[in-house]
Amino acid sequence: LYGCSAENETAAVSSRDYVSEDMRLRIEQLKQSVAGEPTSESTIAERAELLADWIDAYALAGGEVGVDAPGIRIQATLPPTGNAAVTQSRNVDRFVREFALRDEEGALGFLSSDELGPYVVGSMQSLSQTWRVGSRSVETGGGFWVARHFAANFGQFQTDDPAGPGFISIETTDDDAVFEREIYMASGPHGGFEARNAQPAIAFRLVAGELDRGSSVTITYGDQRQGGSGLQMPTFESVRMPLPLYVDLDGSGEWRSLPITPFVIIGGEATGVHAFGPSVVEPGETFELSVRAEDPYFNRASGEMPAFEVLINDEVVATTQAGNEAITVLELSLANTGPHWVSVRSVDGTINGIGNPILVEEYPQYRIYWGDTHGHSGYSEGIGTVDQFMRFARDDARLDYVTHSEHDVWLDAGEWEIIRRATAEYDEPGKFIPFLGWEWTRYTRFGGHHNVLFREIGDQTPVSSLQFPVLSSLYAELHERYDSADIVVIPHAHNPGDFRQSDPQLEPLIEVMSTHGSFQWFMKNYLSHGHEVGVIAASDDHLSRPGYSAPHTGSLAQRGGLGAVLAPVRSRDAIFDGMKAKRTYATTGDRLILKFDVNGTNMGQRAPYSESRVISGRVIGTGPIRSITLYKNDEVLWQEEYLLEDNPGSEQELLLSFNSDSTPYFSGDMPRGWRHWRGELQVNGAELITAIPQDFYNPTTQYFQQNGNVVSFGTHTRGDSSSIRLRLAEVGPDASISLNLEEATETGWAPPFYRQRATIAATSIELNLAEIVAGIMTRNLPQAEYPNDNVTIRRVINGGERDISFTITDTEQPDQGDYYYFKVEQANDAIAWSSPVWVGGYPSQ
């Protein structure tokens, strides 16, 4: 491989054959021009366009181009001026020099590793990468930047204590070479992500001697030779866990990315289990139920698996075999109509889990198909491969449909071709439907992020934001190239879509929730501006784990969402038509069953005008249902709580919930970040028997420990709730909960640009249980711009209903075009939102 390659790879890119003769001539002229006269405001557009074409050609021939190179095309589309032109001109020249090196066989050397794994998540290991000098020596002043991928949560890197964990060492076979450590402030995906959030990184500078051809350098991560315990592995599995490495050959400060060494990380010992089945089946129909053993971080477990009993409505219906397979697929059938609840337990009773509810119906009009329209792998700023992404969606998450929606600003032509081919290869008609698509990636002021899906898998190419950089140009070019019936565009709320414009032929849905948070305000913004859109949720997972995405950072901080599509059959056209018709609903990851109609018209549709509206809904939950809220034109029309206990005794169960608003304070801004709730709660005047966190899945930002009557905890909310269930005994008349919260600053990627992140002062409050009225009490804990952030205590029953139907008649102030939708919240903090039903009026055209 030209440039730098893995040691054992054969040549895949040739300077003689991967571009045409004419383009080669133009490239050589570009190299000479840059060498003779730096790029400037007057030349940047022409040079950037040729450079971008060069980069894509190199990528199509199999070359790795690094993370940032594809983005250079925007300089041709929107040529910068002033200071921006100076900065971006330097970037153009830097990449010209870099790709001149990549075209030179062996110029960037050869990278290898003797042991790629597999390594168990969270374990302490020593890993190494060895770089061998190629055709270009490393001059004095050159060196290596030992980068960290922002999403790879390895343990700490350090160079101060050889006997400590995470010690990074460098050694070379060149006896004359001397390295010194320096601190490099790194931004981008291999640093602090944003330039304003650059993070200190380790670099080694060659301060004496040169590295000549034939010599090598070895970087050891978690060096154990002087007593160190090693480097802690990340908490998530991957077939391509990155330890990015960059080289500076000449001391210029221009770091050249080397190929990612594909270290393999696998899940740990089985501590949990989950079952996946269809949501709707007919009586006697044979269906598949997948039983998946998982570790504490929701990875597929490794090692020895116990046998599991599968229970439906608390009766054992099947038992899996013990062994080393983490996933077992069973064939089952159910005779009786109605809802059925699935649970799983190991035969020794030490591991317990649940599955999704299954509704048995005769001749169902629609079935429910689950998917994830928004996920990433390592082809932009994420981790993993498209094959890992597709296998996880199909085998682990048991999705019906999925889209690998890579950011176009980091996506080169070679990676798009890999994604296109893999999407076609994994297509299994009638069983697993991957939709080809990408994420149009622009800041909110230019239109915000939008996922674009194609109905069919063909030779389509993205309408990239690098060439079509405002939302109106995306819509226009999609209409120019494709049939609007075969396109679905979905704006999302993190880097939010511009709700002032929405193309009704292309954009039937909006994404209301992802691992970034819950954003019901986003739905309200679109609907209140007259756009006829349904709702969907997705993961926005960046680790090749769509559909069953566990949180692991301070921004991708909650479980990934799911989109439910109502369709008659599991086929490409039926599911796509369901999205186009807005027959969808959104969940925060639990596979609840929702039904909703107004005067017999199903969700996502428009009913004939009537002054009397009979609104009916049904929820079949994965657990007890906490509340249902019905909205009319975004205002609460009706709400019901289902867990409240209004006859307290000496033993009580409480659900303590923290809640915060995620609505942008200023219109057009980014959503408010995560509010962190950290501190202690103490139960007074009663005995705390158990305290159970309801949604504490993030190993980075959440923690929980009970010590007698005191609980230490840390959690966070962003448009949702995070709850702790408390069981008390010997509750006295003066019983209370003392809540002491620490100072905390809001977090999250893409922070607001109008409003600064707020730091919320430490506070203490006393919650007297005698003040609970009708089973519920709310105390506001405001932040200046958000007066309704609160903590709510519910006195709750043990258990609760999982299947609830409701019917409401509305005759108040009817108007043409009124719309209705509902939200359901469970005791475990799971949420689902229906798509609206409109009454009368007419849709936007």
Set out the residue ranges of the language-model regions.
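Ser/Thr/Pro/Gly-rich, low-complexity intrinsically disordered stalk/linker tracts of secreted
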Residues: 14-272
